[in-house]
């Protein structure tokens, strides 16, 4: 089953930011106060979500090098320092001591699984690995020179034709879990083709 149980989830101490913490931006004599927010690892950010609505101004950040697209308790990334963490756990630790399904469980449910939970999760995924009958013929429609990611993407899209009940744009939590398990199970099978 899992190689881990050496993995440990680290609590990340996040600096408290109060409502009084703001940044002032002045352009052409007009000043706006924008809230300061703290990220998952104490990095500070200016929340500019209201800037355009309040002033008509936008920001420019080529390549989004200084832009966080959302707040996330799932992933922390700092490319300059070579840091990637999932739920506070360094990716190197997950790669060395964890499995694909343990990491998936961590990302989905927010914590590393206990042995019994991992066994149930592994079983649920393994029960869904086979592809629908006839789907293999779609591989023959792809050029032999197709990029692997293009082929995988196309095949994932084709899966939705076989599972129309899983394409609800507003799924219940149970249905969402069903979709996640199906994709976790079938993507390695698709990639193996």
Question: Where are the predicted features?
Answer:
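Hydrophobic alpha-helical bundle cores within soluble ligand-binding/oligomerization subdomains
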Residues: 5-193
């Amino acid at each position: 089953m899992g190689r881990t149980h050496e993995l440990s989830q680290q609590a990340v101490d996040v600096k408290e930011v109060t409502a009084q913490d703001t940044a002032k931006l002045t352009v052409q004599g007009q000043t706006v106060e924008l809230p300061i927010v703290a990220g998952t690892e104490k990095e500070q950010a200016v929340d500019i979500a209201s800037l355009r609505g309040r002033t008509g101004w936008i920001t420019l950040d080529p390549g989004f090098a200084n832009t966080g697209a959302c707040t996330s308790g799932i992933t922390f990334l700092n490319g300059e320092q070579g840091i990637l963490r999932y739920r506070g756990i360094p990716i190197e630790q997950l790669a060395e001591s964890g499995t694909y399904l343990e990491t998936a469980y961590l990302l989905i449910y927010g914590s590393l699984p206990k042995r019994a939970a991992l066994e149930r999760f592994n079983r649920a995924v393994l029960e869904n690995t086979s592809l629908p009958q006839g789907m293999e013929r779609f591989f023959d429609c792809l050029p032999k020179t197709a990029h692997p990611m293009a082929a995988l993407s196309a095949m994932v899209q084709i899966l939705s034709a076989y599972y129309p009940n899983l394409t609800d744009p507003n799924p219940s939590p149970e249905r969402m879990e069903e979709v996640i398990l199906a994709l976790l199970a079938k993507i390695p099978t698709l990639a193996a083709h």
